[in-house]
Amino acid sequence: MATPPKRFCPSPSTSSEGTRIKKISIEGNIAAGKSTFVNILKQASEDWEVVPEPVARWCNVQSTQEEFEELTTSQKSGGNVLQMMYEKPERWSFTFQSYACLSRIRAQLASLNGKLKDAEKPVLFFERSVYSDRYIFASNLYESDCMNETEWTIYQDWHDWMNSQFGQSLELDGIIYLRATPEKCLNRIYLRGRNEEQGIPLEYLEKLHYKHESWLLHRTLKTSFDYLQEVPVLTLDVNEDFKDKHESLVEKVKEFLSTL
């Protein structure tokens, strides 16, 4: 296994102004409101940038933000690995989780060389992290018998190695936890109408909610990355629609950032 950091020591990524780029992960259940939230943050400051989840790559659909990018080999094959995972989780969970993490690492690393290089007080917001990939979603699939013992062992070994190679550049300064009930998330799944997600049962969301609570609220979830225990967490209750509460949310985020 990769040797985890022994203390909280974020990576030294800096802007051209000489200011270290703060890296914040936005975490939460499926349909908690992460995409809406990161769009609010993106518009709040020129010194802030967001890295959305690469859902388009998982679905073989180029989003408007990524029209300039060439299709990867896996996209050209025409596979919707997200839909495949939901339809046959025992067959495709290992494949999906491996590719989800790989595409996330690629997107987040690429963002470090983006517009924030010229920012005065740069902050980079990730929509989820490599840690929730493993300790929330992949582990839940393993515990639900959608990954067998061999697949889970290989996934953990692969995840450890990937983080030993690239993880220092992606280490977090803080986490924002968008907290919503599983019932509210299920309702939002129906409302946003993403075809691949329409068969998700409440029980699945409840399991993910429990893991998020253990990790970010109670801080009892154990990981291989010691420094995560010291990363500050801002918890925001998002059960209510927050589309009309932009200013309040942004102020809470600014206050949180000032403490980091």
Swiss-Prot record:
Keywords: ATP-binding, Kinase, Nucleotide-binding, Nucleus, Phosphoprotein, Transferase. Its main location: nucleus. Its EC number is 2.7.1.74, 2.7.1.76, 2.7.1.113. GO terms for cellular component: cytosol; nucleoplasm. One of its GO terms (biological process) is pyrimidine nucleotide metabolic process. One of its GO terms (molecular function) is protein homodimerization activity. ATP binds at residues 28-36, 188-192, 240-242. It is found in: Nucleus. InterPro entries: DCK/DGK, Deoxyribonucleoside_kinase, DNK_dom, P-loop_NTPase. The modification Phosphothreonine is found at T72. The modification Phosphoserine is found at S11, S15, S74. Substrate binds at E53, Y86, Q97, R128, D133, E197. It comes from the Eukaryota. It catalyses: 2'-deoxycytidine + a ribonucleoside 5'-triphosphate = dCMP + a ribonucleoside 5'-diphosphate + H(+); 2'-deoxyadenosine + ATP = dAMP + ADP + H(+); 2'-deoxyguanosine + ATP = dGMP + ADP + H(+). Homodimer. Belongs to the DCK/DGK family. Phosphorylates the deoxyribonucleosides deoxycytidine, deoxyguanosine and deoxyadenosine. PANTHER family: DEOXYCYTIDINE KINASE, DEOXYNUCLEOSIDE KINASE. This is Deoxycytidine kinase. It comes from Mus musculus.
